[in-house]
Amino acid sequence: MHVGYIIAACAVVGLLAETQADARDIRLARDGKSEYTIVLSKDASPSEKHAARELQKFLLEISGAELPIATEGDKLPKRMIVLGDGKALRSLKVCIDFRDLGDEGFAIKSAWPHLVIAGGRLRGTMYGVYAFLEEVLGCRWYSSRVSRIPKKRAITLKPLDIVRKPDFEYREPGYTDAFDADWAARNRANSSYARLDEARGGKIGYFPFVHTFNGLVPPWKYAKDHPEYYSFINGKRKTEGTQLCMTNPEVVRIAMETVLRWIKERPDAKIYSVSHNDWYENCQCEKCKAVDEEEGSPCGLLLRFVNAIAAEVEKKHPDKLVDTLAYQWTEKPPRITKPRANVRVRLCAIFQCQYHPYEQCEKNKAFVERLREWSGITDNLYVWHYNTNFPNYLFPMPDLDELAADIPMYKRFAVKGIYAEGNYSSTGGFMDELKAYAIAKLLWNTKADAGAIRDDFLNGYFGKAGKPIGRFLDLLHGKVRAENIHGDIWDTVDAQFLSPEVMAESERLFDEAEKLADDPDVLERVKHTRLSLEYVKIIREVNKVGASGTPEEKAATLNRLEAFVRECEADGMMQLKEGCSIRARFEEFAQPLRK
C-alpha cells in the first residue's frame, strides 16, 4: 500500500480533528504554537540536516508554528519529531529495517507522543520528510515556480505506520524545469541533470552522459597515426563519423585508461558511459564481423568491450558503474555475452509510436519483445524513454496515456532505471511541467493513479482554468485512441489527429480557460500552454504560404511568425527544436517566405 492511498486514514488536519482527537493522536501545532522539537542525530547526514530545515520551513508556512531544530543530547525533548537513526530513535524502540530501506527508502511512524521520519542516510530521511509534507499535510511542488502549501490552524495526526521504497533506482524526468535542485529533491527525482548538491542528497550522476566513443579514443588524437582504431567500412578505415574497432586490444586499453581517468577527475559521478556514437557505421572488419555473427548481434561485441572495461573498474572502484546503450545497431541483445553486474544497459525506445501504451499498439510489439529479451539477460536494465517531439518542442503530443501505462510496464519487466527524455534544453515545451511532475510521481510509485496525478496538477497549476485544459487533453488523447492514430517523436504540425474540428474545439476550450483564470500568474500559464496551438497554426500557415503565397501574403505571414517567436522568447524559450536556437529555427521557417 502506498501513502497516496491512505491519506484519509492517516491524517485529519483542522478544527474537526482537534475536537474529535483520540488520546493517541499527535497534536503537532495549533494557533501558531507547537510543543515539538525537530531532533537530529549527532552524525546526521547533509541531507538529513537539510530535511530538518525544510520541515521547519514548511511547518511554519502551514501552521505559523516555528519548531526548533536540535541535535540529540543526554536529555531529549518531551515531544520530538525524530529525523534519522540515532540515540533519539533508539530510545523510542521503534523498529525500522534500515538495511532493507537502502539509500532512498524511509519510514514514517508514530511513537506517541513522538513522530519518527527515518530512512537511508543518503536521501531516505529527506524523502520521508517530503512524503510527510506532501501526502499527509497536502503540500505540492508542481514546478520550480508553482507550489501549493496549505494553511492550517491546527495539525493533528492519526497514528502513522508507513514504509516506502522507490520502484526504480534511477529516476530522471528529462525536462529543463525538473533540473531545479529543490523541485527534484522534493519530488524524489535523483536525476543526473538535476542541480542536486550534497545537502539535497546528491544524485545518480553520469559522466559523460552518452555517446562517448569519440571521447574514449579521440579521433583528433589517434586517427592520423592509427586509423585501425576506427571502423572499417567499404574496404577502408573511416576516421570521421565513425565508431571504434572494438576487437583491437589497443582500443580496449586506451578506452579503459580513459574511463579510469574520468573516475579520477569526476569522482562525484556514479555511472560512466561507454556508449557508441549517435549514428551507425559500426566496424565491419573481419574480426568484428566474426564476433557479430557469433553473437547474432553487434551488441555482443559492444558488451564484450564494455565488460572488459567494467571488470577493471570493479577492481579499482567497486562503488562505480559503467553504462552503455542498446540503441540503433545495438538494440538487439546478443546470444552469448551478458552484461556484468556493474554494467547498466540503457534500452532506447526511440522508434516507437508514442501515442498508445506499448503493449496495446501493434507498432510497438517488436519493442516490447525486445524489452522482454533484455530483461531476460540482465537484472540491471535501464530504459531511455522519449517524451517530446524533437523538431517541434511545442507540438501538442498526446502521450499521457502511453506514459501512464508504460512506466508501470517497465517495472513489470524488472527495469531498474528510466531516463525520460523530454525538452531538456529549453523551457516551454508542450505541457512540460505536467509531464515532468507525472513522470516523477510514477517513477517513484508505479501504482500511483496517473489520472489523479494529472487532475491534481491541473487544479493546482491552473486553478479553475484547469478543467477546460483537462478537457483539451482529453480531446487530443480521445482522438488518437478512438481512431487508432499513430505518431512518433518526429511528428509534424500536419498530424492527422489535429483535424479542423479538434483545432476549433481546442481554441474554444482555451478561450474558456482564459476567462476562468482569476489570477494574472494563472492567466500567464494558460497563455503559455496555448502557444502549442498557436505554433501549429502559424507553422501550417508558413508551410502553405511559403509554397504558394503571393509576395504580400508571404510578408504578412513573416510578420506573424516574427511576432510568435518574440512571444516565445518573452516566455523564456530558448529552443523550438532540439539543438537549434529559437532564432535559428525562425530562420529555417522564414526562408521560404523570403523567396
Regions found by a protein language model. Give the residues of each.
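Feature activates predominantly on carbohydrate-active enzymes
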Residues: 51-54, 58-60, 96-304, 314-318, ...
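Well-ordered, non-membrane alpha-helical segments in soluble/globular domains
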Residues: 256-258, 296-311, 361-372, 398-407, ...
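Acidic, contiguous N-terminal accessory segments
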Residues: 6-12, 17-107, 147, 153-161
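Structured mid-domain segments that build the active-site/substrate or prosthetic-cofactor binding neighborhood
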Residues: 250-253, 261, 365-467, 471
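Loop/turn elements at helix/coil->beta-strand transitions in domains of secreted/extracellular proteins
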Residues: 34-35, 65, 76-79, 113, ...
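Substrate-binding cleft/loops of secretory-pathway carbohydrate-active enzymes
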Residues: 323-351, 394-401, 427-436
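Catalytic domains of carbohydrate-active enzymes that cleave complex glycans
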Residues: 414, 442-595
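Acidic, His- and aromatic-enriched active-site or binding-groove loops in soluble protein domains
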Residues: 292-309, 340-360, 438-448
